[in-house]
From Swiss-Prot:
Highest taxon, organism lineage: Eukaryota
Cystine pairings recorded for this chain: none
GO cellular component, one term: plasma membrane
Keywords carried by this UniProt record: Cell membrane, Lysosome, Membrane, Transmembrane, Transmembrane helix
Pfam families in UniProt: Frag1
GO biological process, one term: proprioception
Extracellular topological segments: 31-64, 119-130, 190-192
Name of the protein in its database record: Transmembrane protein 150C
Catalytic activity: Ca(2+)(in) = Ca(2+)(out); Na(+)(in) = Na(+)(out); K(+)(in) = K(+)(out); Mg(2+)(in) = Mg(2+)(out)
Example GO molecular function: mechanosensitive monoatomic cation channel activity
Function in brief: Nonselective cationic channel with high permeability to Ca(2+). Component of a mechanosensitive cation channel. Confers mechanically activated (MA) currents with slow inactivation kinetics. May contribute to proprioception.
Species: Bos taurus (Bovine)
Membrane topology: Multi-pass membrane protein
Length: 249
């Protein structure tokens, strides 16, 4: 891959993945240090530690909760930006837009879920927190499958299979983790459920990092134009737009 020909937008999903991963692990280590949770590699519980190392429990009390809220808010914002850019990227390349629109809506709902679970801690409002968790995991999983299908279908720069197959594998891994997580939770096997949850989140973040492969081919621009007093007619506007169609913003 020639770095000189790569768009700077490829770094957006990478920043999302690295920043969110680092932030969540900081929350984890703060909670372990404060004896709020016991470590993921513990064979048994430490004396005085009451909780399994779920992400929500790790970020439930200050100071970890402050970091957790900030990380989830920033992650939700970056995920929303990725969702919009991905939608714009694929819009001129898909004949039936419903799948692309579904991917945008699903990721927007997952982003909204991130803000709920990040700002409504488990002990403060468990119901809203769980709604946020369901939105994030549920629509996040749906997003992964939709984007995997779009990757194989659109085949940008003939890299559809190279990127699509790893996304299918990650989507299957995420789906398996979600199923295992709820099964283990229902059976009260909290240590293994917490480990699966961390694996699930890392798979999600790895998936988002793969968007860098396709974003490196695209340049996005924000165009600012001065307000004109003399309006063009609607037909003239359409005519100009049809003459200058690109897949850039």
């Amino acid at each position: 891959m020639d770095g000189k020909k790569c768009s700077v937008w490829m770094f957006l999903p990478l920043v999302f993945t690295v920043f969110t991963s680092a932030g969540l692990w900081i929350v984890y280590f703060i909670a372990v240090e404060d004896d709020k949770i016991f470590p993921l590699n513990s064979a048994e519980r430490k004396p005085g530690v009451k909780h399994a190392p779920y992400i929500s429990i790790a970020g439930d009390e200050p100071p970890a909760s402050c970091v957790f809220s900030q990380v989830m808010n920033m992650a939700a914002f970056l995920a929303l930006v990725v969702a919009v850019l991905r939608f714009i990227q694929l819009k001129p390349k898909v004949l039936n837009p419903w799948l692309n629109i579904s991917g945008l809506v699903a990721l927007c709902l997952a982003s909204f879920g991130m803000t709920l679970l990040g700002n409504f801690q488990l002990t403060n409002d468990e119901e809203i927190h769980n709604v946020g968790t369901s939105l994030t995991f549920g629509f996040g999983t749906l997003t992964c499958w939709i984007q995997a299908a779009l990757t194989l279908k659109v085949n940008i720069k003939n890299e559809g299979r190279k990127v699509g197959i790893p996304r299918v594998i990650l989507s299957a891994s995420i789906t398996l983790c979600v199923v295992l997580y709820f099964i283990l939770m229902a059976q009260g096997i909290h240590m293994y459920a917490a480990r699966v949850q961390w694996g699930l989140v890392m798979c999600f973040l790895s998936y988002f990092g793969t968007f860098a492969v396709e974003f490196r081919h695209y340049r996005y621009e924000i165009v600012c134009s001065e307000y004109q007093e003399n309006f063009l007619s609607f037909s003239e506007s359409l005519s100009e737009a049809s003459e200058y169609q690109t897949d850039q913003v």
